[in-house]
Amino acid sequence: MFSLHIDTARTWRGGQNQVLVTVMGMRSAGHRAMLVAHGDGELRRRADEGLDFLPLAPRTEMDLSAAWRLSRAIKQLRPDIIHAHDPHGVAMAALALSMSTQPKRAKLVAARRVDFRLKGNALSRWKYDQVDRFICASDAIRKILLADGVAPSRAVTVHEGIDLGHVAAAPRAALHEEFWLPHGAPIVGNVAALVPHKGQRHFVEAAALVVREVPDARFVIAGEGELRPTLEHLIKHLNLEKHVILAGFRPDVLSLHKAFDVFVMSSVTEGLGTSLLDAMACGRPIVATTAGGMPEVVQDGRTGILVPPRSDRALADAIIKLLKDEALRERMGAAGMSLVNAKFSAERMVADTLSVYEGIARR
């Protein structure tokens, strides 16, 4: 099975990590896989030297030049599957396939990792009509696609997976020393892009409530994005400069997870949340909202605590409960690690994805 994978992002987030895990997993399973991505992007920088790579990214969603270059590559390479991992990639692949004169075209698979509705404009409707199969990161995402009119037979759920070997090999970050934190101060962590739907504003508001009861608690937010100035202002307004740290983009997120005492996902919308998987694989107890597919990962009361989105008080109460109960933290952390090992490995995700490929390639 030869699959060609398209990701047009220049930055590195959970989606790009899943692309790389999928591509490398296909190769490890003995299948050919090629990556089409931004020539100057973070994904290319992190890809193995020996990986088949085509530097190509559309400047706009209707970049006919990029689509033409892709169509020529498809004609030459003749992949069985084209797996587009973002909306611009879907558009470029759909345009490229429409230019093909081959009697049998490659099957188009679209990854869907966000719990947003499909856009209703003409271009969006056209490009998604060309998709042979949607691979959804959660059942919550699949339900949204079905509500948008996608036939049930065209959408399948494949939960994301993580490389457990990388998790085991990551050293623990020395955050107390790096940020000059008080000895023994518990650390509550959040790893996500600083964008509105990740809900870090609620995380900071909850921190203000937590420190009233656990004054030595510290909060580390790893990520960058448009929300940074807003969060900086909020932290100052709430007098939390000594308690909340904006750590910026970090390539060592697994090491960070191992240094956290509690991991919090404050999203107001979320496809699945691979940061949850990373944290659970590192044995961290979770506080997460019920947004999107997160309840498919976090078992409330067993591997973590689920709270309603946008509820600062509920978020704070859950954090306080865990910070005050070490035995509960250890029990939930161990249960989360066991769950990820059993159900959310990269090998399982790759095998399920390959099964989707094989099912549509035979048609």
Region spans (language model):
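A conserved mid-protein helix/loop that constitutes part of the nucleotide-sugar donor-binding site
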Residues: R13-M24, P186, N190-R212, F219, ...
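A conserved, positively charged/aromatic
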Residues: Q102-D139
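Aromatic "clamp/platform" in nucleotide-sugar-dependent glycosyltransferases that forms part
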Residues: F249, V268
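Short hydrophobic beta-strand element within catalytic cores of glycosyltransferases
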Residues: L35-A37, P285-A288, V298
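A short helix/loop element that forms part of the nucleotide-sugar donor recognition site in Leloir-type
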Residues: V167-L181, K236, V350
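Carbohydrate-associated surface elements
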Residues: A140, G161
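Conserved acidic donor-binding segment of nucleotide-sugar-dependent glycosyltransferases
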Residues: D300-G301, I305-D312, K321-A327
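A short, well-ordered alpha-helix in the C-terminal region of glycosyltransferases
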Residues: A314, K321, L328-K343, D352-S355
